[in-house]
């Protein structure tokens, strides 16, 4: 898992507002980016750092669940609360070994602590049934890989309920 920060010239206003409402203080927005492919993960991290302040990466869904406090049932509750409070958005690849991004989405949406965190699914495959299944299960958005800066802007607009 890797966590890095950077300065922002613009923030995802809605996520920032929601983050401020739920957490009551101004701190960096935190995006958890999950992808098993190192190159894709680094690309997503870089694009998000341009638009957001902080990105944590995970190489698979199981690592993401561990980070979110949903992996090991014996984790200390303070660590769980700490990480949950910091995550403003989860962006995950769909197709990963062990656990898919869709399965990660379902786990997040089943969690009382995490269900309000927006989840964006990415895939290099444009399969309408897969896209619809993810959106119906609570994904905020489904994005085609490889991600581009314009996609991050589209994501920001979508989160602000703008028309793309």
Curated annotation (Swiss-Prot):
Q: Does this entry carry the keyword Transcription? A: yes
Query: What SMART domains has UniProt attached to this entry?
Result: REC
State the encoding gene: ARR16
InterPro entries in alphabetical order: ARR-like, CheY-like_superfamily, Sig_transdc_resp-reg_receiver
Name listed for the protein in its UniProt record: Two-component response regulator ARR16
Domain Response regulatory, which positions?
30-160
Query: What PROSITE patterns does the database record attribute to this sequence?
Result: RESPONSE_REGULATORY
Keyword terms of this UniProt record: Cytokinin signaling pathway, Nucleus, Phosphoprotein, Transcription, Transcription regulation, Two-component regulatory system
Which organism is this protein's natural source? Answer: Arabidopsis thaliana
Describe its function. Answer: Functions as a response regulator involved in His-to-Asp phosphorelay signal transduction system. Phosphorylation of the Asp residue in the receiver domain activates the ability of the protein to promote the transcription of target genes. Type-A response regulators seem to act as negative regulators of the cytokinin signaling.
Coiled coil, from the record: none
């Amino acid at each position: 898992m890797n966590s890095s920060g950077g300065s922002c010239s613009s923030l995802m206003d809605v996520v920032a507002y929601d983050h401020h409402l739920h957490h009551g203080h101004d701190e960096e927005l935190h995006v958890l980016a999950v992808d098993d492919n190192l190159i894709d993960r680094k690309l997503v991290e870089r694009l998000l750092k341009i638009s957001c302040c902080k990105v944590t990466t995970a190489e698979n869904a199981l690592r993401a669940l561990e980070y979110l406090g949903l992996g090991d049932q014996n984790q200390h509750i303070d660590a769980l609360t700490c990480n949950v409070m910091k995550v403003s958005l989860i962006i995950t690849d769909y197709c990963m070994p062990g656990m898919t991004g869709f399965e990660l989405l379902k786990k997040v949406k089943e969690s009382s602590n995490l269900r309000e965190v927006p989840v964006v699914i990415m895939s290099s495959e444009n399969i309408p049934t897969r896209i619809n299944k993810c959106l119906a299960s609570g994904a905020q958005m489904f994005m085609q890989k490889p991600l581009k800066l314009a996609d991050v802007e589209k994501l920001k607009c979508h989160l602000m309920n703008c028309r793309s």
